[in-house]
UniProtKB/Swiss-Prot annotation:
Residues 5-120 form the MTTase N-terminal domain. This is Ribosomal protein uS12 methylthiotransferase RimO. [4Fe-4S] cluster 1 binds at C14, C50, C79. It is found in: Cytoplasm. Its main location: cytoplasm. Keywords: 4Fe-4S, Cytoplasm, Iron, Iron-sulfur, Metal-binding, S-adenosyl-L-methionine, Transferase. It catalyses: L-aspartate(89)-[ribosomal protein uS12]-hydrogen + (sulfur carrier)-SH + AH2 + 2 S-adenosyl-L-methionine = 3-methylsulfanyl-L-aspartate(89)-[ribosomal protein uS12]-hydrogen + (sulfur carrier)-H + 5'-deoxyadenosine + L-methionine + A + S-adenosyl-L-homocysteine + 2 H(+). Its EC number is 2.8.4.4. InterPro entries: Elp3/MiaA/NifB-like_rSAM, Methylthiotransferase, Methylthiotransferase_CS, Methylthiotransferase_N, Methylthiotransferase_N_sf, NA-bd_OB-fold, Ribosomal_uS12_MeSTrfase_RimO, rSAM. GO terms for molecular function: 4 iron, 4 sulfur cluster binding; aspartic acid methylthiotransferase activity; metal ion binding; protein methylthiotransferase activity. Binds 2 [4Fe-4S] clusters. One cluster is coordinated with 3 cysteines and an exchangeable S-adenosyl-L-methionine.
Amino acid sequence: MSQSPKVGFVSLGCPKALVDSEQIITQLRAEGYEISGSYDGADLVVVNTCGFIDEAVQESLDAIGEALTENGKVIVTGCLGAKSSASGSNLIEEVHPKVLAVTGPHAVGEVMQAVHSHLPKPHDPFVDLVPAAGIKLTPRHYAYLKISEGCNHRCTFCIIPSMRGDLVSRPVAEVMLEAENLFKSGVKELLVISQDTSAYGVDVKYRTGFWNGKPIKTRMTDLVAALGELAAQYGAWVRLHYVYPYPSVDEVIPLMAEGPFKGHVLPYLDVPFQHAHPEVLKRMKRPANAEKVLERVQKWREICPDLTIRSTFIAGFPGETEEQFETLLDFIREAELDRVGCFAYSPVEGATANDLDGALPDEVREERRARFMEVAEEVSANRMQRKIGKTLKVLIDEVSAEGGIGRTAADAPEIDGVVYVEPAAKASKRYKVGDFVSVKITGADGHDLWGEV
């Protein structure tokens, strides 16, 4: 029997791009292609790119160039594939004219067509080798679940809609089937992602779908409840990311705090507030009522005292005054957000914010970002200290002779903190990657925790 054709794969960018990569690799394996771990062992290479900020664009272009140098046969997909150069031509084809094909994001069919054109699929694929959950690039015990593509917002600093298009929600039955297959495969934590999780179903007017004969509206609250019910059957977690602060978010908080989904729909919200001053938010084309946001945060915590709120912000946006920046710092102190990231504003080619007046010097933007993070880290450290002495449920991510490393309900992988657990030899019971263990917290800093099983 002839040897199966081999495809190399490079995946860059955010978790949503990672899911695109997983879907492409799943289809490749389903058709009998093998995935090569090296350039020289591959018959061709697929590069999934990011094009959100200038650094990501350069990283993607460099990765394409490296793949061309090391292999020579390269197919490009992802957000950068939808980006034009200053001359109006495709940026990738202009910089790297030797690539075999270029597609935009979430284009599994187009990528497979390009692969077929340059590397025909084998006649006898081993379909049974592909698990129902698909091929995942994350560790076996957690996975990302993408529920929609695109975004209907037109934030002035963002070009995602120009690359990924308007919101397109996945059918609820399709989402639930993928979630079930993931839980069956041993996944202990599902991280729900999209460009705008709160808007799930807006594009289909919240139509009713069916899962195992049960009606479920294509709507965030209904989907989260269904996922929570499913997660409870497997003793697993569901974590919500990219939750735009719509009023509908208020309906999800009780699912985290009480009833059958408590402990499965995690008390964790990733909400991108971006700023707190109404004038800056207006220039960003974001919701512009910080006082109402503070009231909602307080209400959420009254309903769900264990709630962890993560958010991201932009410092040094065009036109931002020192007074407006101080308003942002006051908001961080008063809201007491648990996990916070901040970017110094950086112009993105194609973003309408580039046309705004009041651009700030690089040193001012960076200085404000640094001041922001000082305040945010102080707030985080104070909140982390309150956890000392508590016993928390921890999902183990790593185990070594030095002990275990895991995460609580307050910690998403890659972006939040971890819990350093005492060495396994001293633990009251053995544990392995993917296990849930109860850990008594003995120490904390501004980011991480230490504890004993």
